[in-house]
Curated annotation (Swiss-Prot):
Swiss-Prot/TrEMBL keywords: Secreted, Signal
Species per Swiss-Prot/TrEMBL record: Mus musculus
Location within or outside the cell: Secreted
Lineage top rank: taxon: Eukaryota
This protein's GO CC annotations: extracellular region
Designated name of the protein: Uncharacterized protein C17orf67 homolog
Leader sequence residues: 1-20
Chief place of localization: secreted
Name of the gene: Gm525
InterPro entries to which the protein is assigned, alphabetical: DUF4543
Pfam families: DUF4543
Amino acid sequence: MEKLFVLVFALALLAFSSDASPILTEKQAKQLLRSRRQDRPNKPGFPDEPMREYMHHLLALEHRAEEQFLEHWLNPHCKPHCDRNIVHPV
């Protein structure tokens, strides 16, 4: 039991005294956050621009909805309901 305690104490002391500690100083954390974005090019479409990605997603959804709407209204098999000359689309 005493050997286990000494071993755990030695490991804890080693972890806190060496640079193996996972806790970063504020300066190191800011430097890491600053440098992380520079290792890949900042071109449109990259996840660095989440708003642009979201807008592309919304445009794709809108395009798909428009295609489905036109597919429904131009379907020749539902004539009286889908004929734009007879019925105004709601």
